[in-house]
Amino acid sequence: MALSRRDFLKSSAAAAAASAVGLSVPKEVEAASKEAQKGWRWDKAVCRFCGTGCGIMIATKDDRIVAVKGDPLAPVNRGLNCIKGYFTAKIMYGADRLKTPLLRMNDKGEFDKKGKFRPVSWKRAFDEMEKQFRKAYNELGPTGVAFFGSGQYTVMEGYAAAKLMKAGFRSNNIDPNARHCMASAVAGFIQTFGIDEPAGCYDDIELTDTIVLWGSNMAEMHPILWARCTDRKLSDPNKVKVVVLSTYTHRSCDLADDVIIFKPNTDLAIWNYIARSIVYDHPDAIDWNFVKEYCVFATGYPDIGYGMRNPKRAEELGYSKKEMQTVWHQDHKKLSEDEKRALAPFGYGNADVMKMKHVKAAGKHWAISFEEFKKSLEPYTLDYVAKVAKGDPDESLESFKAKLQRLKDLYVEKGRKVVSFWTMGMNQHTRGTWDNELSYVVHFLLGKQALPGSGAFSLTGQPSACGTAREVGTFAHRLPADMVVFNPKHRAIAEKIWKLPKGTINPKVGSHIVKIMRDLEDGKIKFAWVHVCNPWQDTANANHWIKAARDMDNFIVVSDGYPGISAKVADLILPSAMIYEKWGAYGNAERRTQHWRQQVTPVGDAMPDIWQYTEFAKRFKLKDVWKEWKLPDGTVLPNVLDEAKKMGYSEDDTLFDVLFANDYYRSFKWPDPIGEGFLNTEAEGDKRNVIGADGKPWKGYGFFIQKALWEEYRKFGEGRGHDYAPFDVYHKVRGLRWPVVNGKDTPWRFNVNYDPYAKREKELGHVKGEFAFYGHALKVIPQGSLTGPDKNKPKIHLPNKAKIFARPYMEPPEVPDNEYDTWLCTGRVLEHWHSGTMTMRVPELYRAVPEALCYMHPEDAKKRGVKRGDLVVIESRRGKCKARVETRGRNRPPRGLVFVPWFDERVYINLVTLDATCPISKQTDYKKCAVKIYKA
């Protein structure tokens, strides 16, 4: 059979696609495919994008990626990919890929903050970077410098960055963009369970009878999981029910049996309605054995503010009068009648204004009785909640009530398995921690948690927000394996593993990502290094942060693959190797860790982030950083140099020598059998002979630094419920769900039938039944009532118990009014990732969705004299941007709300959004603020 070149290529592509999903193809076509694939090397990897963690197969030829397909052996996606996954390799080959360091300079070749970007060598870049770092560090100490981290760090990158910052520079000012996406989930886990991350796994989808989405457009944000949900629904459509709760209609609603459109923030009231119905109307549905054996009731303060700036400081900085209208709610807020009713059991029923007295005690909580808990639920009758929560003005109240009742009935039905999924809708919320806690309330009361097919399940947004940001501990307060910097026992463990003198690690929590921005504006931080994120596009109320970057005496470094907004406002840009140009590992939403090998050489002079951190570490000696420091709050970090000398260190040793090139690290030899035939730029250099940070051709460290980082990191989790397998094992399997004990992973945590740690608690006689909530954090708490802790009662210990929280409904700090009459919600779309820095460079994805649109109800458009395709201004008290109107399509808001994605830097929606956060988690609420919209 003769084939033309065109037919040959088409046949090859068809054969490759067919084989990827296990279809048989004609022999002629198969032969053509094999001919086309001559010289290709296939290897397993993981997708670059969302927290689903899909496995992919990558084909390389002549040092370039030539094909990507779903990995049929990957248990997460079983050979499927979404549109981003299929084009994941193309993100590396955009026309404007950064290939050399760029420094703002004047015509004399000197650094000039007002100068233009000019190409420089790695040495020149690091010379200036070192100079500016030392300037800030020597002036302000460890609190004067910061790293913007990421939920897209590889595990080893995040570990190296955190170790450099916390063990080396003695600063806790490292915080990831995962603060924006998962912090409320984290706080909910820690406060409820005493340990982070979900109990369940993706297998729950195939095992459940009921899928409920709370603020999650899984069809676009976790499309492969949604494919599994769809398959489950279609497998038994009469039994399996799907309910979607959202503030607007989207693609996930197409599969739903019920769609509940609620008013922003009122998910708090809906959760409480379900809990009230259980306690007051269906007490027989309560699993009292579960509740009494494994739970305790608790509550905390409601008057905790909204995570905004101190209003007086905002006034000093010249915030506008309109902006201050909202900011003052951080100090006090007039309560609506609906809020008064919800807050009455907490002692605020007669208060017209809530004074935010407990801003600094937002996370404090105490045990209460069941009767007190029951009292907190009293306001949430069906009539009250329906009136408060109905989000679509065109839906009848009776229709909305009926949906709430059907939702409640699904949860309450005995024997029915229920999984509650959520993502940013619940997490990006000024009461996001409360919202997460309330999800567990319902599941705990019913005994439907930590069981196959039943549980409250927080879905991660980013590919390694779990595996790196959370597990590694790249947050301002964390160390690996759920340890925290303010716990002296945890610091001692870290200092032992890292071989540090006692007292090296700073005990003070650093600045979270929003506070880093505020500290730059305040002059408290003067050096910031951005890793694997785009915070100047991503952070709400961006006008302030642009000013802090460009108009103040701050030095901003951005390591990136492309020139996004953060790079454009920076002083120095460092070109980073992208995902398959380096070794790495990600951890997904079901605790599954997956590793990959370096597939190709980085482009241009781009270098891996690990190399950037370790090369920078070479420029600082112990005597520069381990001396005594007096911090702004009066804390004194001791001089640990004498102790370091006793440990065999010299004060002239570099941080690289001590942290990344000690005898332990050098024991991991390269070459290594696991990497046979593969590149390792950090270990051995590569064919480019890049002129490195020391001005010499880069030839590698000579040891397997990525493996060393992994093996040291996993020491933190061993025996502490965060056990990982050895490095080599992950290159032989399709990921493992931790804890990994005796070579076996754990599908369901806290369940003695599946979790070795829970099983051990039962064997030791610490629990009687099937569950053990063995997390240790926040397990000694006071006692009290709904109105506060009781100092006369002793604290109680809660081994192996979880908490059922009483949390009231409250409104957000900014709601629509006569001038700013519309809710604004932001989010993502299927085709683009986060700020679009990568996906907007992929021609196929760009053509599919070339710009961000303002999704609006047709009646709202008509009211404003605009139509589909018209350009409008979206304006808030903080800023404005322009976008084109869309009144049809995938997102269909109710009247009074618009949805604008944030992937398009030309539609800079974070100039408009409000930088209010959950006071407990410090996560920004991007889902609600008030705007006005008019024709441009």
From Swiss-Prot:
Residues 1-31 form the signal peptide. Keywords: 4Fe-4S, Electron transport, Iron, Iron-sulfur, Metal-binding, Molybdenum, Nitrate assimilation, Oxidoreductase, Periplasm, Signal, Transport. Pfam families: Molybdop_Fe4S4 (PF04879), Molybdopterin (PF00384), Molydop_binding (PF01568), TAT_signal (PF10518). InterPro entries: Asp_de-COase-like_dom_sf, CT_Nitrate-R-NapA-like, MoPterin_dinucl-bd_dom, Mopterin_OxRdtase, Mopterin_OxRdtase_4Fe-4S_dom, MopterinOxRdtase_cofactor_BS, Periplasm_NO3_reductase_lsu, Prok_molybdopt-oxidoreductase. Binds 1 [4Fe-4S] cluster. Predicted to be exported by the Tat system. The position of the signal peptide cleavage has not been experimentally proven. GO terms for molecular function: 4 iron, 4 sulfur cluster binding; electron transfer activity; iron ion binding; molybdenum ion binding; molybdopterin cofactor binding; nitrate reductase (cytochrome) activity. Mo-bis(molybdopterin guanine dinucleotide) binds at residues 84, 152, 177, 181, 214-221, 246-250, 424, 428, 534, 559-560, 582, 609, 826-835, 910, 927. [4Fe-4S] cluster binds at residues 47, 50, 54, 82. It catalyses: 2 Fe(II)-[cytochrome] + nitrate + 2 H(+) = 2 Fe(III)-[cytochrome] + nitrite + H2O. It is found in: Periplasm. Its EC number is 1.9.6.1. Residues 40-96 form the 4Fe-4S Mo/W bis-MGD-type domain. GO terms for biological process: Mo-molybdopterin cofactor biosynthetic process; nitrate assimilation. Its cofactor is [4Fe-4S] cluster; Mo-bis(molybdopterin guanine dinucleotide). Catalytic subunit of the periplasmic nitrate reductase complex NapAB. Receives electrons from NapB and catalyzes the reduction of nitrate to nitrite. HAMAP family: Nitrate_reduct_NapA. NCBIfam families: NAPA, PRK13532.1, TAT_signal_seq. Belongs to the prokaryotic molybdopterin-containing oxidoreductase family. NasA/NapA/NarB subfamily. Component of the periplasmic nitrate reductase NapAB complex composed of NapA and NapB. This is Periplasmic nitrate reductase. It comes from Nitratiruptor sp. (strain SB155-2). The lineage of its organism: Bacteria, Pseudomonadati, Campylobacterota, Epsilonproteobacteria, Nautiliales.
